[in-house]
Curated annotation (Swiss-Prot):
Membrane topology: Single-pass type I membrane protein
Spans traversing the lipid bilayer: 462-482
Organism (species): Infectious hematopoietic necrosis virus (strain Oregon69) (IHNV)
One GO BP: symbiont entry into host cell
Residues in the Virion surface compartment per record: 21-461
Signal peptide feature range: 1-20
Name this polypeptide is given: Glycoprotein
Length: 508
């Protein structure tokens, strides 16, 4: 049969199978793409330290693996307008700061003969979102503990200073709802700045961001059609995971009609030089937002397949949790094979860091592995390393003179064993004590919660009681007793109304 007759017939059937309008691309643009494979490697770009947060091992999430098998599909060049991502994405993060309210406390306990015990503590001071912008703030470098204020034969004499200070923190912004997304927020997202975090004394404040209605852009891509069922399957463009169209529907947003894809992205698809627009039935609900970004298992369909690489990642996750340690090789299992906005991870000095950043496809790695060439780039670039040194990068990449890439190393006969060296994972510290890490006397300092009682109630003294009970003779008698019984006493414990320790590791 003449192909000039069969092709229009096949494309007309697409409308019936996918409940969309008639699709009639130019037959001259048809191209069969049987093997559109994943790139060998992906790597973050522009993922600086202020976009990362320390996380517990339980918060690691394996990447989605999208089915990029295109056998049996026909690809048609098309124009795609997306509200979320494109080839020239720009800044996907919103700049901001964590605002901390912390009481710096110095505690002095003095014995009868003048011996002193000095303690230092940080105390959470509850900070509301309304209060966050009401006071002038300083920087972490300007913080200090007050000088001790000691009294003879008195325990737990406190000298307090309250500071409001900021630390830089950028977060991802939902391009549709303009919600702020970050693991530091309660529930993983915040609707309006200032935003409350998991810590009662820390609030995030940032810019409003760019309205979604003004951020759409047109990119080039392909529309894939199943040869047998004649259904529209997906749309693709470099720099994004495939847009699944199995359960696509039409929804109104910003005064325009958009295709809501299987994972919630909003796109529009034009073909035949913009003469035709792809459409679907109306959505039954009006939900708009980046579905699935906060929970890896929030939305699963047949675009996400149970693949070998995903199983390897789940096994790596189980090993990390059971041993409370991580190696560069295990961390490499959490790298997404798809370019675009992805969860990224790094390991550094006992901590695992997480962020959501743009990743690019790597087409070529230099022979010494110190640089790479991104897809469509003409020059080589050094690997980004967020911690300011030349050792640790993202997803297990490490090394000084020779860069070790676990994804490549596992294929060679003489692999570098450094990718198997474990790092014990520390509990995630409270963010308000990070400023103290450069001090030398901070081993006993930790963050504490503030109880409801008056801070001054911890001040107590024997001296008024001594004076009232008989003056000098009683004082001498008390001195003899102190010599006999108290000279070798251990360090004075905290008062009975002690402030409970704050353990961030309990956070899920």
């Amino acid at each position: 049969m003449d192909t000039t007759i069969t092709t229009p017939l096949i494309l007309i059937l697409i409308t019936c199978g996918a409940n969309s309008q008639t699709v009639k691309p130019d037959t001259a643009s048809e191209s069969d793409q049987p093997t559109w494979s994943n790139p060998l490697f992906t790597y973050p770009e522009g993922c600086t330290l202020d976009k990362l947060s320390k996380v517990n091992a339980s918060q690691l999430r394996c990447p989605r693996i999208f089915d990029d098998e295109n056998r049996g599909l026909i690809a048609y060049p098309t124009s795609i307008r997306s509200l979320s991502v494109g080839n020239d994405l720009g800044d996907i993060h919103t700049q901001g700061n964590h605002i901390h309210k912390v009481l710096y406390r110095t505690i002095c306990s003095t014995g009868f003969f003048g011996g002193q015990t000095i303690e230092k503590a940080l105390v959470e001071m509850k900070l509301s979102t309304k209060e966050a912008g009401a006071y002038d703030t300083t920087t972490a470098a300007a913080l200090y503990f007050p000088a001790p204020r000691c009294q003879w034969y008195t325990d737990n004499v406190q000298n307090d200073l309250i500071f409001y200070y900021t630390t830089q923190k950028s977060v991802l912004r939902d391009p549709y709802t303009r919600d702020f997304l970050d693991s530091d927020f309660i529930g993983g997202k915040c609707t309006k700045s200032p935003c409350q975090t998991h810590w009662s004394n820390v609030v995030w404040m940032g810019d409003a961001g760019i309205p979604a209605c003004d951020s759409s852009q047109e990119i080039k891509g392909h529309l894939f059609v199943d040869k047998i069922s004649n259904r529209v399957v997906k749309a693709t463009s470099y720099g994004h995971h495939p847009w699944g169209l199995h359960q696509a529907c039409m929804i109104e947003f910003c005064g325009k009609q958009w295709i809501r894809t299987d994972l919630g992205d909003l796109i529009s698809v034009e073909y035949n030089s913009g003469a035709e627009i792809l459409s679907f039935p109306k959505c039954e609900d009006k939900t708009v937002g980046m579905r699935g970004n906060l929970d890896d298992f929030a939305y699963l369909d047949d675009l996400v397949k149970a693949s070998e690489s995903r199983e390897e990642c789940l096994e790596a996750h189980a090993e990390i949790i059971s041993t409370n340690s991580v190696t560069p090789y295990l961390l490499s299992k959490f790298r997404s094979p798809h370019p675009g906005i992805n969860d990224v991870y790094a390991m550094h000095k006992g901590s695992i860091y997480h962020g959501m950043c743009m990743t690019v496809a790597v087409d070529e790695v230099s022979k010494d592995r110190t640089t790479y060439r991104a897809h469509r780039a003409t020059s080589f670039t050094k690997w980004e390393r967020p911690f300011g040194d030349e050792w640790e990068g993202f997803h297990g990449l490490h090394g000084n003179n020779t860069t070790i890439i676990p994804d490549l190393e596992k294929y060679v006969a003489q692999y570098k064993t450094s990718m198997m060296e474990p790092m014990s994972i520390k509990s995630v510290p409270h963010p308000s004590i990070l400023a103290l890490y450069n001090e030398t006397d901070v081993s006993g300092i930790s963050i504490r919660k503030l109880d409801s009682f008056d801070l001054q109630s911890l001040h107590w003294s024997f001296w008024p009681t001594i004076s009232a009970l008989g003056g000098i003779p009683f004082a001498l008698l008390l001195a003899v007793a102190a010599c006999c019984c108290w000279s070798g006493r251990p360090p004075t414990p905290s008062a009975s109304q002690s402030i409970p320790m704050y353990h961030l590791a309990n956070r899920s």
